[in-house]
């Protein structure tokens, strides 16, 4: 859960740098490695998105490029 929280903080930092906000998120594709508590994951994502509902895809992977990393989120955002 800590890596998921950190991933969202990185997303928000990049959104701010581009003068964007959560409402500008269009699509999230999340890759997870290992066992995850579904209820905790859903609660964290819901709290981070604060009611915004972009298109989302969740995939479980055997591994990511760095074995220490257990979560990766590919984000699309758009604004005028």
Give the ranges of each region predicted by the language model.
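Short, polar/acidic, helix-capping and beta-turn segments at strand->helix junctions
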Residues: 1-80
């Amino acid at each position: 859960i800590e890596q998921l929280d950190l991933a969202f903080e990185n997303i928000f930092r990049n959104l701010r740098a581009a003068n964007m906000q959560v409402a500008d998120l269009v699509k999230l594709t999340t890759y997870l490695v290992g066992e995850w508590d579904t209820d905790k994951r859903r609660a964290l994502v819901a709290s981070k998105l604060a009611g915004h509902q972009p298109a989302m895809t969740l995939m479980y992977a055997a591994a990511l490029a760095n074995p220490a990393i257990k979560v990766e989120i590919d984000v699309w955002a758009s604004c005028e």
